[in-house]
Amino acid sequence: MRKTVEHFLAHGAKAGNMYAVGKRVCPWYAATMSVAAGMTGERTAPLVWIDEAGRSAGEWGEYWEINEKGGARMRPWFMTAAANTLYAIDRLFVADADGEIRIAFHVPEKWRAFSFTLPSEAGVTVRAEARDGRIVRLELLGSRTFGPYRLRLRTELLGDGFVRNFNILSRADERGETVLTIGALSAAEGVENLHD
């Protein structure tokens, strides 16, 4: 998949519109490339592609199939592109890949404060809050027994004492990333918290 993403990064503008007009990439394709780039482990490309998708927005924020200022314009209110872009934005915060739940993995470093509650594809809802560039609260919510799970976060997002409340089976630090393997949790345990 990495070669496909790299090829599209290099050549997408040549054939990336919905129709053979214009000079940019259609927002649906751009959002799809954001997700694909994230799945390959790219850190910055997902946001670049989300920004590209956003370039097609009109005066009211509506997405177009093609909306190039001073150039080609086709079909406003392209809702599948808008939904695909929303999905790509969600995956900046919570993305399941390679048997892991990646938490805030693609959030830009300049975003120093954020919070979210989003479902993961693994059946767990992830709730997190960051302040001053550090995650200060992380909750996993499930309606059934779940786990064990591997969570991957950028190490710089973790504060001291961040992991004390989970049943941590293992912790590995690799290339600026921290991987936590968390033991099984039951619905009866409710919410498990990580606090800084």
PLM ranges: what are they?
Residues M1-E100, V136:
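Active-site core of glycosidic bond-cleaving carbohydrate-active enzymes
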Residues P76-R127, R131:
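Catalytic cores of secreted or luminal carbohydrate-active enzymes
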Residues A97, L157, F162, E174-G176:
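Repetitive beta-strand solenoid architecture
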Residues I103-F105, L140-L157:
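Surface-exposed beta-strand/loop patches in extracellular or lumenal glycoproteins
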Residues K110-R112, A122, R134, T145, ...:
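Residues that act as N-cap/strand-start positions at coil-to-secondary-structure junctions
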Residues A122-Y149:
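Carbohydrate-binding surface patches
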Residues L151-L169:
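Solvent-exposed beta-hairpin/edge-strand motifs
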Residues N167-D196:
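C-terminal beta-strand-rich structural cap/linker in extracellular carbohydrate-active enzymes
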